[in-house]
Amino acid sequence: MKNINPTHTHAWKSLEAHKAELSNITIQDLFKQEKNRFDDYSLTFNNQILIDFSKNNINQTTLSHLRQLAQECALDSAKEAMFTGEKINRTENRAVLHTALRNRTNTPVLVDGKDVMPEVNAVLAKMKDFCQRIISGEWKGYTGKAITDVVNIGIGGSDLGPYMVTEALRPYKNHLNMHFVSNVDGTHIAETLKKVNPETTLFLVASKTFTTQETMTNAQSARDWLLKAAKDESAVAKHFAALSTNAKDVEKFGIDTNNMFEFWDWVGGRYSLWSAIGLSIALSIGFENFEALLNGAHEMDKHFLSTPIEQNIPTTLALVGLWNTNFLGAQTEAILPYDQYLHRFAAYFQQGNMESNGKYVDRDGNVIKNYQTGPIIWGEPGTNGQHAFYQLIHQGTTLIPCDFIAPAQRHNPLADHHNKLLSNFFAQTEALAFGKTKEEVEAEFVKAGKSLDDVKNIVPFKVFTGNKPTNSILVQKITPFTLGALIAMYEHKIFVQGVIFNIFSFDQWGVELGKQLANRILPELTDSEKVASHDSSTNGLINQFKAWR
């Protein structure tokens, strides 16, 4: 990948000038100027996903400059570099090949001259066999009973992705009950163990190194709990499997290495649900549905790699998002799914985006001073959010671009629930774009029989300025295929922005310092002695903790 400071490009300078030209033009104005705006600013994928980005403060000139920016930042060659196994994660000297995990064509993908696809397919075949044994009931626990509950123990990408997907695809789940434990707070594992039976529970320990502190602490507690009931070390092998590469420690734990599922250092944690880390997904929805998830992502990969920039969905979303943050001043983006099954979707891409693009040093090692990198990502399902934080989106002083996501077809046809849900989905983007003027507010009062003199003091509070940017993402139905495509779409959006920001999107050094300090502090918490080895604040907090515990 080439290292190009985006602010040094001709396109960036053109965008700065263009921003001034658009400064007095609103989204409302743009819809008046462009009669076919919906048709001209929407894209479809596979006739199953519609992306409407017309309610952004952009015109064709904006898009032209943004596409030129992508070209000047060598996006096409960066895409090629990622898909062909070049080591674009330079700080860790690794390839970035989550796309190979869902490569359904078996086209060779080379890392250091070796095709990785045979190994990828071998792990998938092993996962398929394992899933069939668990789901069919062939696999027995230590008392001869079939498995009824699966507990995935992981953290970060080993937890967020599988949990999000299993929740999103609950309509496809089988009889197995799925549980996810991540937090090192003992409450998380303790409350989970209260719900399950040691005779019929399978634990998946998801840690590449088998040394992750949070994961191994929880795994050890689960092991102790099992052995308290089984009273036989051999029971561990019947109730634990590992998603790891550390065969020595896996075996030492008591897990049969035949039930160890490998993945590779070219799979980043936040992109790992497509790998063996997705075993909990496959167990929950069945391996055929897991393959459909991979197929959807693969189709989006093909779209991203080969579709011209004008029709390229992930690239378009990335460019519009970059415009909103770097030229219109937004610092956050909200992801708002109008589907309760997608209740962890925003949290998943909070990690995906912020851990990838939350960087202040560019690929040349220079501190970034004159542009913004990754935005803050957050969100909750609609309509819950409407009764919580939409007030600020509508009438606050902070610009918050939003992605609204909704399925046209429902999984639970209850009365008119879905029409009511979708009426809110459509209404919110319309309200954010067009608002309500002072004149419209006054007209409503007059129609209700009020005099303008009586309501003049309340009118300003009921005005909505509008001009708030949104994308509407309408999915025909949330299926394994469409969910896979949606996830891959956001992954590639993040990649495109990282390329243009001139940062390394696939490392996460920012998580290391806190872990290092925690390892230093942990031994200091074992006794009652006062500490004085830190700053006064940290010393004071530790000493108060010791006094109160």
Swiss-Prot record:
Known SUPFAM superfamilies for this protein? Answer: SIS domain
Pathway of action:
Carbohydrate biosynthesis; gluconeogenesis; Carbohydrate degradation; glycolysis; D-glyceraldehyde 3-phosphate and glycerone phosphate from D-glucose: step 2/4
Q: Where in the cell is it found?
A: Cytoplasm
Please describe what this protein does: Catalyzes the reversible isomerization of glucose-6-phosphate to fructose-6-phosphate.
Q: What class of enzyme is it?
A: isomerase
EC number(s) per entry? 5.3.1.9
Kindly give the InterPro entries that the UniProt entry links to this protein. G6P_Isomerase, G6P_Isomerase_C, Phosphoglucose_isomerase_CS, SIS_dom_sf, SIS_PGI_1, SIS_PGI_2
- Name of encoding gene: pgi
The entry's active site is 355 (proton donor), 387, 515
**A Gene Ontology MF term for this entry?**
glucose-6-phosphate isomerase activity
Q: Which reaction does it catalyse?
A: alpha-D-glucose 6-phosphate = beta-D-fructose 6-phosphate
Give Gene Ontology CC terms: cytosol
User: By its UniProt entry, which PROSITE patterns does this protein fall under?
Assistant: P_GLUCOSE_ISOMERASE_1, P_GLUCOSE_ISOMERASE_2, P_GLUCOSE_ISOMERASE_3
Gene Ontology BP, a term: glucose 6-phosphate metabolic process
Family, per the entry? Answer: Belongs to the GPI family.
CDD domains reported for this sequence: SIS_PGI_1 (cd05015), SIS_PGI_2 (cd05016)
Q: What is the source species?
A: Haemophilus influenzae (strain ATCC 51907 / DSM 11121 / KW20 / Rd)
Record key words, sorted: Cytoplasm, Gluconeogenesis, Glycolysis, Isomerase
Report the HAMAP family cross-referenced here. G6P_isomerase
**The name this protein goes by in its record:** Glucose-6-phosphate isomerase
